[in-house]
């Protein structure tokens, strides 16, 4: 996951990590995490802090080292910037701007991307994403489909 980050992002995260790592020992404890979160106006409980650490503490030692921190940041970034990207992608597919992606619109975009799909393949893609069964994909269905891949 962290391999999807640019050099610039990694160096920014290194700075952020140093801010968290108050005693400079190369790891972030729940206490250090709490201090930084509170300075950012958050008020996490001890249990929440422990959960945050456990979520990314790959080696299970109770602290976060830099590689674990990078993984956490990469996850967060994927989650946030994907929302914007998904909105943009939906607009690309929804040619007529009516809030729905039809089979024809899907076929058109896929063809432009160099994916020659049969009618059956296009219908199958629509069916997989079409939760409410109206034969087209609305924004919610599109988001679900994009986040589940």
UniProtKB/Swiss-Prot annotation:
- Function according to Swiss-Prot or TrEMBL: Calmodulin mediates the control of a large number of enzymes, ion channels and other proteins by Ca(2+). Among the enzymes to be stimulated by the calmodulin-Ca(2+) complex are a number of protein kinases and phosphatases.
Q: Where is the EF-hand domain?
A: 8-43, 44-79, 81-116, 117-149
Which Gene3D superfamilies does this UniProt record tie to the protein? EF-hand
What extra comment accompanies this record? This protein has four functional calcium-binding sites.
Residues holding Ca(2+) 2: 57, 59, 61, 63, 68
One GO MF term: calcium ion binding
Q: Which residues bind Ca(2+) 3?
A: 94, 96, 98, 100, 105
| Native source organism of the sequence | Pleurotus ostreatus (Oyster mushroom)
Designated name of the protein: Calmodulin
Family matches, as Pfam families:
EF-hand_7
Q: List the disulfide bonds.
A: none
UniProt key word Acetylation: yes
Which residues make up the binding site for Ca(2+) 4? 130, 132, 134, 136, 141
**One GO CC annotation:** myosin II complex
Q: Which UniProt keywords apply?
A: Acetylation, Calcium, Metal-binding, Repeat
For the ligand (Ca(2+) 1), the binding residues are 21, 23, 25, 27, 32
Q: Keyword Ribosomal protein: yes or no?
A: no
Positions where N-acetylalanine occurs in the chain: 2
InterPro entries assigned to the protein according to its UniProt record, in alphabetical order: CALM/Myosin/TropC-like (IPR050230), EF-hand-dom_pair (IPR011992), EF_Hand_1_Ca_BS (IPR018247), EF_hand_dom (IPR002048)
Assigned protein family: Belongs to the calmodulin family.
């Amino acid at each position: 996951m962290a391999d999807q980050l640019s050099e610039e992002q990694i160096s920014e995260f290194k700075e952020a990590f140093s801010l968290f790592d108050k005693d400079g020992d190369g790891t972030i404890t729940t206490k250090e995490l709490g201090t930084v979160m509170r300075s950012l106006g958050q008020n996490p409980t001890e249990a929440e802090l422990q959960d945050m650490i456990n979520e990314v503490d790959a080696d299970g030692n109770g602290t976060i080292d830099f590689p674990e921190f990078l993984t956490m940041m990469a996850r967060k970034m994927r989650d946030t910037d994907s929302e914007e990207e998904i909105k943009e992608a939906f607009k690309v597919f929804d040619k007529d701007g009516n809030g729905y992606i039809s089979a024809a619109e899907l076929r058109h975009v896929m063809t432009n991307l160099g994916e020659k799909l049969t009618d059956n393949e296009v219908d199958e893609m629509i069916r997989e994403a079409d939760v409410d069964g109206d034969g087209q994909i609305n924004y919610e269905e599109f988001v679900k489909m994009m986040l589940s891949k």
